[in-house]
């Protein structure tokens, strides 16, 4: 069995690297600022693949770069 734990959200760090704000990311992706904030605070962690792809495309990264992940194989 494979267990995946979601760690820290890396969206703010990726925004800093691209020199854009969360507000700008919201405008680029069409995702509400509050929703992006919820992902960052881990209030929401199960974002849809479409949402993850939109954020990743805007930040020029891969979907798996949006969060730290811990994968355990049992």
From Swiss-Prot:
One GO term in the molecular function aspect is:
DNA binding
Q: Where is the HTH cro/C1-type domain?
A: 11-66
Keyword set, alphabetical order:
DNA-binding, Transcription, Transcription regulation
Matching entries from Pfam families are given as: HTH_26
DNA-binding region residues: the ranges are: 22-41
Q: Which InterPro entries match?
A: Cro/C1-type_HTH, Lambda_DNA-bd_dom_sf
Protein name per Swiss-Prot or TrEMBL? SPbeta prophage-derived uncharacterized HTH-type transcriptional regulator YopS
Species this protein is from? Bacillus subtilis (strain 168)
The organism's lineage is: Bacteria, Bacillati, Bacillota, Bacilli, Bacillales
């Amino acid at each position: 069995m494979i267990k995946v734990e979601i760690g820290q959200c890396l969206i703010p760090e990726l925004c800093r690297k691209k020199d854009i704000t969360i507000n700008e990311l919201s405008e680029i992706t069409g995702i509400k600022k509050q929703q992006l904030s919820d992902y960052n605070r881990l209030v929401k962690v199960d974002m849809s693949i479409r949402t993850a792809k939109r954020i990743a495309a805007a930040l020029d990264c891969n979907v798996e770069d949006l969060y730290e992940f811990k994968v355990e194989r049992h």
